[in-house]
Curated annotation (Swiss-Prot):
The gene is fusA. Disulfide bonds: none annotated. PROSITE patterns: G_TR_1 (PS00301), G_TR_2 (PS51722). Residues 8-282 form the tr-type G domain. It comes from Onion yellows phytoplasma (strain OY-M). This is Elongation factor G. PANTHER family: RIBOSOME-RELEASING FACTOR 2, MITOCHONDRIAL (PTHR43261:SF1), TRANSLATION ELONGATION FACTOR G-RELATED (PTHR43261).
């Protein structure tokens, strides 16, 4: 089957934003205007097409990223709608990894919010070009100029309006196009069926000012435009459009649009901007990977190149089983083909190829460069794996995910539940790289860990609904960590010799703090005092011991371990003996490495009316919070603080009480920090 849409006319985009900025509503309107759906569903009514999970429809939030394909002006647009809640940022991260462009939706009243900053940072890591849609222009307190100012102040980016609103709040009824220099006035009885009109006379002055600001910003990035501007030559709309596209593709400039998705205003103009300014797969840089010898391989995005793709999401479907979502970077693939998972070195067979629309699907026989699809039948492939045609060894850069910060114990209610629970949890962990399952070696309990209380609530709900597993859960616990703060050299010696073959393993290790870099192992053995075949056992012994901790049984992180000496026995040495010796050497750091307990610190932002600022600050301080800043925001004050996670359980109820239900808050993991002595002693005592 031949390709239906050229690469130039394909767009792979994501919709990203802070929670409640209107991402899913925006996506619904896009689908409506492109003819993909014929009846609009509302998120707050639980009728959204893109929020298809039961929990999403009940809670009115997006939990997973849903994929769909729409068509506009002879272009195919693959869209991924992502969650805004901080507990589900992994969905945003893995979507951005495979997208070429994004629409960032921000609230016209709130401007840039904490999760906007997080998703913006994630998009910047992957160098994703973006257009910005200032939504909810009909909302009380909407202020387009303020929203743009927050983009510059909080994100520090070159962002300029390419549109200007006609009115705001209830009077928002049109948009001025600063590129074409005309206006579009909406017919409020049937939005988006308005007409092009001259720019209102009372807005001519600000329109010219804003167009000049746009040109000034772009001229710092575009030499040709700068010459025209300095020489006061007329700048055509075509020239301005080309300059916007060029700067947007380089992610050095971000055009700002306005509208109200709920009222159906500005969405068609945004679709035009997606086609005009966001990149096609052939506009982005060639994909770079590495072969088995760690040599760089560059692949251009052409159908004629060998097939290479990245798996970015795995999910369990009740009808077809395991679905693997992937993005093709070069070449093409047919249903039924055999491919290599070059990350794991395994062979996989592609079953059915599916074009997804939220949770419905359309089968296709062949897929090409730039396509985002799902495939049935992959056995070993997980998130971040590279898939390539047979004979290739190229591996693309994978994805890094944050470690969980909160954990609970789950206990099956019956024997039947016990049998099902292990399988269900394994499937859920396969879908979500930030969800971890492990056993507490002391109590034998099954522990599940995630990014927040909502994250784990959803997991427990899915256990019950999708897998029919009934389970009891404990109160949430903080996922503390341990580390050492002092460099030390320790000896580990394991000798058992009592007739017959014994055990002999002997190592000298140097352990040193490795802040923010995780675990690192270095082999500095000279002269074979520890034979090469036992070195992996030493590394494994240390890694296993790290998981069990040295102070209170919490995982040890950020440690560099160097094997520099030791000895062996020709007959009695074994991998097991060296593993045990290595773990003994690590345990010695309890007395020599000045170990400490680390606690997760959360970045908390509370938005409260002025009347309650004192209450909120006093309460945060009592929770060991460190105030970072506070700023006025519309008719409220935004207070930002770093607070230990252990102090934040039940905070929503207290905040409601302290502010008569008028404040909101959001928190996300910021970093691990050394716990105070009193807290450390309390933790050790509790775990003893």
């Amino acid at each position: 089957m031949a390709r239906q849409f050229s690469l130039e006319k394909t767009r792979n985009i994501g919709i990203i934003a802070h929670i409640d900025a209107g991402k899913t509503t925006t996506t619904e309107r896009i689908l409506f205007h492109t003819g993909k759906i014929h009846k609009i569903g509302e998120t707050h009514d639980g009728a959204s097409q893109m929020d298809w999970m039961e929990q999403e429809q009940e809670r009115g939030i997006t939990i997973t990223s849903a994929a769909t394909t729409a068509f506009w002006k002879d272009h195919r647009i693959n869209i991924i709608d992502t969650p805004g809640h901080v507990d589900f940022t992994v969905e945003v991260s893995r979507s951005l990894r495979v997208l070429d462009g994004a629409v960032t939706v921000i609230d016209a009243q709130a401007g840039v919010e904490p999760q906007t900053e997080t998703v913006w940072r994630q998009a910047s890591e992957y160098k994703v070009p973006r257009v910005i849609f200032v939504n909810k222009m009909d909302k009380v307190g909407a202020d387009f100029a303020y929203a743009i100012e927050t983009l510059k102040q909080r994100l520090g980016v070159h962002a300029s309006a390419i549109q200007w609103p006609i009115g705001s709040e209830n009077d928002f009824n049109g948009i001025i196009d600063l590129v074409e220099m005309n206006a579009f006035e909406y017919d409020n009885t049937s939005p988006e069926t308005g007409k092009v009109v001259p720019i209102p006379s009372d807005l001519e002055s600000i329109t010219q000012t804003k167009r000049n600001e746009l040109i000034e910003t772009l001229s710092t990035l575009d030499e040709e435009l700068m010459m025209y501007y300095l020489e006061e030559k007329p700048i055509s709309s075509e020239m301005l459009k080309n300059s916007i596209r060029k700067a947007t593709l380089q992610a050095s400039f971000f055009p700002v649009l306005c509208g109200s998705s709920f009222k159906n205003k500005g969405v068609v103009k945004m679709l035009d901007a997606i086609v005009d300014y966001l990149p096609a797969p052939c506009d982005v840089a060639a994909i770079v990977g590495f072969d088995s010898d760690n040599q760089e391989i560059v692949r251009t995005g052409l159908d004629e190149e060998p097939f290479i793709a990245l798996a970015f999401k795995v999910m369990t479907d009740p009808y077809v089983g395991k679905l693997t979502f992937f993005r093709i970077y070069s070449g093409s693939v047919k249903a039924g083909s055999y491919v290599t998972n070059t990350t794991k070195g395994t062979k996989e067979r592609f079953g059915r190829l599916l074009q997804m629309h939220a949770n419905s699907r359309e089968e296709v026989k062949e897929a090409y460069t730039g396509d985002i699809l799902a495939v049935v039948g992959l056995k070993a492939t997980t998130t971040g794996d590279t898939l390539a045609s047979e004979g290739q060894t190229i591996v693309l850069e994978s994805m890094n995910f944050p470690e969980p910060v909160i954990e609970i114990a789950v206990e099956p209610k019956t024997k039947a539940d016990q049998d099902k629970m292990g399988i269900a949890l394994a499937k859920l962990a396969e879908e979500d790289p930030t969800f971890k399952v492990f056993s507490n070696h002391e109590t034998g309990q099954t522990i599940i860990a995630g990014m927040g209380e909502l994250h784990l609530d959803i997991i427990i709900e899915r256990l019950k609904r999708e897998f029919k597993v009934q389970a009891n859960v404990t109160e949430p616990q903080v996922a503390y960590r341990e580390t050492i703060t002092q460099e030390t050299e320790t000896e580990g010696k394991f000798i058992r010799q009592s007739g017959g073959r014994g055990q002999y393993g002997h190592v000298w290790m140097r352990f040193e703090p490795n802040p923010g870099k995780g675990f690192e192992f270095v082999n500095k053995i000279v002269g074979g005092v520890v034979p090469r075949e036992y070195v992996p056992a030493v590394q494994k012994g240390i890694q296993e011991a790290l998981a069990g901790g040295i102070l209170a049984g919490y995982q040890i992180i950020d440690v560099k371990a160097t094997l520099f000496d030791g000895s062996y026995h020709d007959v009695d040495s074994s991998e097991m003996a060296f593993k045990i010796a290595a773990s003994m050497a690590l345990k010695e750091t309890k007395t020599k490495g000045n170990p400490v307990i680390l606690e997760p610190i959360m970045d908390v932002e509370v938005v409260t009316p002025n009347d309650y600022v004192g209450n909120v600050i006093g309460d945060l301080t009592s929770r060991r919070g460190r105030l970072e800043n506070q700023e006025s925001r519309a008719n409220a004050v935004a207070i930002r603080a770093f607070v230990p996670l252990s102090e934040m359980f039940g905070y929503a109820t207290v905040l409601r009480s302290n502010t008569q239900g008028r404040a909101t808050f959001i928190m996300q993991f910021a970093k691990y920090e050394k716990a105070p002595k009193s807290i450390t002693e309390e933790i050790i005592k509790k775990r003893a």
